[in-house]
Amino acid sequence: MNTQLQQILRSHNDLVTTHEQTRAGFISFALEKNRRSTPYIEEAKSLKELASRANNPEELLNIKEIRRALITASGLSDKALKYFTEDDKVRAVAEMIDNFLKPAGNGFIDELVYRFLLIRGDSLGGTMRNIVGALAQQKLVRCFISTLSVMGIPFTWYDGKSWHIGDTRTPNIEEAKAISWANDKGHRVLAFNLTIKTVNKNVDICLFNANERTFDNNNIAKNCNRSAIMFGELKGGIDPAGADEHWKTGNSALERIRKSFSNVGRDDLQTSFVAAAIEDSTGREIFSQLTDNTLSFAANLTASKQLVSYCNWMILL
C-alpha cells in the first residue's frame, strides 16, 4: 500500500460506507429524481388542460395537440414507436380508450393523465438507472478540477469536440470528457468512458501520459500500450444491496485490464477502484488488494477526504 493511502486508510472499516453516508446518498438521488420529474409533471398538467376539450373519450382522438401524449399513455415507449405503423398507433390508442378510459366514466381525463404519468414514470426510472454513473463521474470530475485549482495547477478540459481553458467557475464543467494538465513527470490526460483497444472493453477512468494533441480526440484509446498510466473502475450506486455485485464486476474488469496490459509488457500499469456503496465484506477484499499492491488505490465516493486524496494521487502520478 502506498504511503498516501496509509495516511487515510487504517483498516478496511475506513472504506465502508456509513449509515449516514448511505442515507445522504439516497436523499441526493431522490432530489435529483424529483428535479428530473418536473418536466413530466408539467407535461401532465398541459395534457389535462388540452384533453378537457373532449366531452367523451372518443373525442380525444380529434385533439391533434395531444396525439403524442395519447400514444404515450397507451403504453408505447419512444423506443418502441419506430417499430409501429400509424395504424398500429391508432389501434393502441383506441384499445386504451375502450379498455380503460370509457370504464372510467366522467373521470376519463384523470385516467388518461394517470396513465400518461405511469408510462413517463417508468421512463424516468430507466433514465435514473442510467444516470447514476454519470452523476458519479460528475462528482469525481468536480473534485478533481477543484483539487487542481487548489494546487495551483493550470488545466484544460475537453467537451467531446474541443479543448477549453480550465476555470472552476465554468458552468457544467463537471461534464468534461477529459482533463489535461502537467506535473513534474510530464503531460497528463485524465479521460472517462473510453473503449481501450488493448482490453476491448469500456474503462471508466483512464489516465494517460499524453497532452491534448496526442490524446487526439479519444483516438489514444486505440493504441495506448505505452502511454497508459492508470485505469480505474467507478461505481456510483448507493444501494448497499448492490455493493457486492459492484465490486465483483469492477474487480473482474480490473483483473482483465491488468492481464491484458501484462501481455504487452506493462506490468507497471496501475489500477484503482472508487465506489459509493462499500460494505464490510467488500471493504475487506479491497483493503487486502491494497495491502498486497494488487490494487494501487481505492476510495469511497461518499468520503470527501478519500476522494480528494484519490484526485491528488492521480494529479501527481
Give the ranges of each region predicted by the language model:
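Generic local-structure boundary detector
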Residues: 37, 51-52, 61, 71-72, ...
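Residue-identity detector for threonine
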Residues: 3, 17-18, 22, 38, ...
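Extended aliphatic helical segments
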Residues: 16, 90-93, 113, 132, ...
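Catalytic core segments in nucleotide and nucleic-acid processing enzymes
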Residues: 164-317
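Alpha-helical structural elements
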Residues: 21-24, 35, 158, 176, ...
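Nuclease-adjacent, charged terminal/linker segments that flank catalytic cores
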Residues: 1-143, 147
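Charge-rich, low-complexity intrinsically disordered linkers/tails
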Residues: 70-72, 82-83, 116-203, 210, ...
